[in-house]
Amino acid sequence: MAKTPRRILAVLCLLAAVFFLLPLGIGILHFGMVWPAALLLLCAARLTWPDFFRRLLRPKWLRALVGCVIAVCMTAILATLGKMAMAAADRPADGQDCTVVVLGCQVFPDGHPSLMLRGRINAAYDYLTAHPETLCIASGGQNGSEPISEAQCIRDTLVSMGIAPERILLEDQSASTEENLAFSAALLREKGLSTDVAIASDNFHQLRAAIWAQRSGLTPYSDGCASPWFLTAGYWARETAALLYMVVTGS
């Protein structure tokens, strides 16, 4: 490849790496930001110093091995992203009787929902408004930095938006997606509610949430919402890694 196109591609890789790391500006750092940024920086280095990498990968068997690993990893990543997108698009049919399960995430120290939790609450509100007979489970416990449980924050916010409090059940003991769905499933059965559930969570989260819902005996559908633009890439990458880890470990 000519030097100028290589430089342009290297700059694009650097810019993409910076994009993945943008959440650092608001104090967020997780694995889904790190591994794509590291790979993009490696690509930028490969484009900038091609002779060094040619010497590094001089043995044909090593080049073939690296090529196979890259092909397998890219296939797995793209297949996982495709399944995630399909799960996010799997919404309930018109007129279908579903119970909404809102999955909690960070609550700010002042008791207000984070941007991501606000998106999930808004998705639940839209569904509950369109289906006035539907009930909702607010699911999420409380960690050390949160003044109230995530479930309580979800409930309080929905009530402030006009949803009747008697339509909202609390599940405030869970500390993971697995527990969100397992504990919500137990509450659904205790109250005799429909086990067809519309999961109010970010689009990237729908596939893993659906897997845990199915393992808890529920029939999941998406009540998904878009994530804030500067968080989206990193969380899709983190979720991809989490799903592939589940496949590899059988968890």
PLM regions: where:
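Internal/C-terminal transmembrane anchor helices
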Residues: 60-83
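Helical transmembrane-bundle signal
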Residues: 16, 20, 43, 73, ...
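Membrane-interface helix-boundary motifs at transmembrane edges
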Residues: 51-63
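Short, Lys/Arg-rich, polar N-terminal cytosolic tail immediately upstream
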Residues: 1-2
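A transmembrane-helix-recognition feature enriched in membrane-embedded lipid enzymes
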Residues: 232-251
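A structural signal for short, hydrophobic/glycine-enriched beta-strand patches
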Residues: 79-238
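Membrane-embedded alpha-helical segments of integral membrane proteins
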Residues: 5-52
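Residue-level signal for protein termini and structural transition zones
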Residues: 12-16, 67, 89-92
